[in-house]
């Protein structure tokens, strides 16, 4: 009896990369390959890499090296793969190198070095494909690439311009996820609010209904499933205003992930980002008037070339007034190929780090203050896991997996992962909440 070929898989990077990995893993299983849990049990290994910032490049190169040392047969894909010379200069013995979102190229390389079985068992693959997330939540990628040319970013050079998935394809996948018991769908892309721009918002059909390829209509359709729908990577276009009433009405979660990046008009122009913080503050105020429960997550870059102390103080003033719920802050790091590398007046490393500390200290006060308001409230939570001490590790609508805070319920008797419960909040920290089941 012929041995079933086995493929090891290492997935690095962001949720978009994880979605690419899921597509490749689904194809591998559909063609009869087994997924090996360890290097020594695999006939070859696929490494899906990240290449966005220097630390990610280093992590990816280390992962490739480890796979080569442990197994010897490695196919590289993902964003670092778009810089093929970088991979081969360090690891010339890899079998093949492809870029991101390259399922067909990866499968071709796998076929070349590990021919597929003659009798694949397609029925071994669930309708929702192979998922890297827990069973109760899933990422739903609606597009690939980006039309923006932010000076600190090289995503368009790695993933190309915006290419929206057909609306019927996205909705069919969402329907399969909901039927399979997924309780939370996280909508991802490089620019979720640009969905359909490249197709001129082409009209599609789902279950006999006409549906426009556009973020608002997508949200309306996803809201029909009665599960959590969370929007990530939203660029602050004017039509984002249209989804706030959907959040107020409970069709999708009142949660917006909008990477504002900075508040100084000068710095934003250097970044080639929208440059009107007063307008942003006015919109945030309006959104909260329409939907008081709205939670806003954002990310910011400090120490960008040309950022002065005055620019940084303007940023601090912005976050104090905006009172965002969840915030990440990064010091600027040059990325090979980014046009920001050519900008004058780089900020010294010690100044970058000092500004990051000051920024996070201000935001910690804001986060703690906003979380204190939750004490005494009853929230619906989704259980991610029960830890070894019997505590339920949960999330509310305000918490995206892996990046936001958590809700802990210490007496988790009868609670199960992947289920919803009502919890009264009794305590908080700067980032997390503690509750008791109701």
Swiss-Prot record:
Binding site for [4Fe-4S] cluster 2: 146, 150, 153
This enzyme's EC code(s): 2.8.4.4
Gene this protein is translated from: rimO
GO biological process, one term: tRNA modification
Primary site of residence: cytoplasm
Protein name, as recorded: Ribosomal protein uS12 methylthiotransferase RimO
Ranges where the Radical SAM core domain occurs: 132-369
Binding site for [4Fe-4S] cluster 1: 14, 50, 79
Reactions catalysed: L-aspartate(89)-[ribosomal protein uS12]-hydrogen + (sulfur carrier)-SH + AH2 + 2 S-adenosyl-L-methionine = 3-methylsulfanyl-L-aspartate(89)-[ribosomal protein uS12]-hydrogen + (sulfur carrier)-H + 5'-deoxyadenosine + L-methionine + A + S-adenosyl-L-homocysteine + 2 H(+)
């Amino acid at each position: 009896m012929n041995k079933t070929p086995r493929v090891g898989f290492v997935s690095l990077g962001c949720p978009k990369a994880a979605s690419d990995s899921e597509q490749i893993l689904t194809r591998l299983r559909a063609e009869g390959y087994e997924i090996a849990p360890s290097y020594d049990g695999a006939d070859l290994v696929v490494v899906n890499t990240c290449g966005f910032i220097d630390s990610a490049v280093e992590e990816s190169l280390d992962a490739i090296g480890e796979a080569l040392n442990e197994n010897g047969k490695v196919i590289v894909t993902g964003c670092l793969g778009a810089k093929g010379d970088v991979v081969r200069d360090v690891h010339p013995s890899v079998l093949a190198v492809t870029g991101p979102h390259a399922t067909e190229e990866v499968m071709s390389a796998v076929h070349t070095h590990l021919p597929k079985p003659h009798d694949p068992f397609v029925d071994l693959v669930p309708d929702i494909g192979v998922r890297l997330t827990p069973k109760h939540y899933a990422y739903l990628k609606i597009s690939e690439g980006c039309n923006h040319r932010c000076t600190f970013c090289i995503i368009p050079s790695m993933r190309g311009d915006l290419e929206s998935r057909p609306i019927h394809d996205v909705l069919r996948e969402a329907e399969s996820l909901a039927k399979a018991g997924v309780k939370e769908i996280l909508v991802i892309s490089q620019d979720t609010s640009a969905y359909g721009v490249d197709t001129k918002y082409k009209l599609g059909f789902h279950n006999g209904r006409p549906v426009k390829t556009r973020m608002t209509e997508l949200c309306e359709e996803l809201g029909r499933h009665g599960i959590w729908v969370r929007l990530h990577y939203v660029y602050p276009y004017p039509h984002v205003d249209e989804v706030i009433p959907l959040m107020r009405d409970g069709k999708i979660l009142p949660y917006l992930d909008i990477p504002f990046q900075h508040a100084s008009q000068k710095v934003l122009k250097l970044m080639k980002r929208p440059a009107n913080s007063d307008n942003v503050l006015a919109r945030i105020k309006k959104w909260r008037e329409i939907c008081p429960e709205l939670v806003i997550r954002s990310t910011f870059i400090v120490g960008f070339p040309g950022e002065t102390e005055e620019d940084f103080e303007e940023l601090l003033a912005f976050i104090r007034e905006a009172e965002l719920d969840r915030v990440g802050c990064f010091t600027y790091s040059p990325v090979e190929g980014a046009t920001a590398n050519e900008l004058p007046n780089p900020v010294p490393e010690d100044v970058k780090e000092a500004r990051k500390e000051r920024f996070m200290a201000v935001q910690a006060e804001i986060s703690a203050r906003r979380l204190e308001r939750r004490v005494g409230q009853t929230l619906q939570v989704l259980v991610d896991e029960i830890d070894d001490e019997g505590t339920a590790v949960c999330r509310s609508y305000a918490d995206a997996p892996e990046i936001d805070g958590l809700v802990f319920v210490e007496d988790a008797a009868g609670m199960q992962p992947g289920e919803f419960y009502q919890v009264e909040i009794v305590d908080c920290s700067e980032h997390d909440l503690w509750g008791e089941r109701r």
